[in-house]
């Protein structure tokens, strides 16, 4: 299930490798796909495994682990971009140059500038440590805010999607972070981007919450079906 999530999340960023390609590659079989694409997927999986090994949940006072924090997020980013596309774009550190969302011809959103990124990410980190809202709504806010900050020069989408199960695990809504939404986002990528864009353009959180929570239901149903099959 984790490998499938890694494949789907990476597909949103332009990779073409399938789960079958990944499994064949790891079994030592020949595959007709770029090696770097497969390693991007493997790195995604490694980044999540790193987080699982190093974070503790919000009410676990006996663990030596760390809270879900920018320190964890930066290390995940470093692992994600290790020796693959984007490895020259400051892995493990917040952006030093302005980034944009969209194509060169059509920029539809300009994220937070580099000089304000640390401040905004510190605020987001503090927000992740509170539980004053419904946790599913809060996870929708965390994901959207991360994407609007776009703190790294590359790899923001994948890290932002990883934050969803990690946040719910950290807040103890999940006993293990095996809840993934990349399949839902990938099913209509333009709609996903449109809802995120409308938050910044029109402050339209209502439609984002509706879209996101519908995705929670779809993803939960999909996860349940997979567990039954396995």
Regions found by a protein language model. Name each.
Residues 1-230:
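FIC/Doc superfamily catalytic core
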């Amino acid at each position: 299930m984790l490998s499938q999530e890694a494949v789907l999340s990476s597909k949103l960023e332009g990779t073409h490798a399938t789960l079958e390609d990944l499994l064949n590659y790891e079994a030592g079989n020949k595959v007709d796909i770029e090696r770097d694409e497969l390693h991007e997927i493997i790195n995604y999986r490694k980044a999540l495994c790193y987080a699982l090994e190093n974070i503790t949940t919000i009410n676990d006072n006996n663990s030596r682990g760390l809270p879900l924090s920018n320190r964890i997020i930066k290390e995940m980013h470093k692992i994600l971009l290790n020796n693959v596309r984007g490895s020259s774009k400051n892995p493990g550190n917040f952006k030093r140059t302005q980034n944009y969302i969209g194509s060169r011809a059509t920029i539809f959103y300009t994220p937070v500038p580099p000089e304000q990124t640390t401040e905004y990410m510190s605020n987001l980190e503090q927000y992740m440590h509170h539980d004053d809202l419904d946790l599913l709504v809060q996870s929708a806010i965390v994901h959207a805010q991360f994407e609007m900050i776009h703190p790294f020069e590359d790899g923001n989408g994948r890290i932002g999607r990883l934050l969803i199960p990690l946040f719910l695990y950290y807040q103890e809504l999940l006993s293990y972070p095996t809840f993934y939404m990349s399949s839902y986002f990938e099913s209509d990528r333009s709609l996903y981007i449109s809802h995120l864009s409308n938050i910044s353009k029109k402050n339209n959180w209502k439609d984002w919450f509706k879209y996101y929570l519908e995705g929670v239901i779809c993803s939960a149903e999909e996860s349940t079906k997979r567990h039954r099959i396995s």
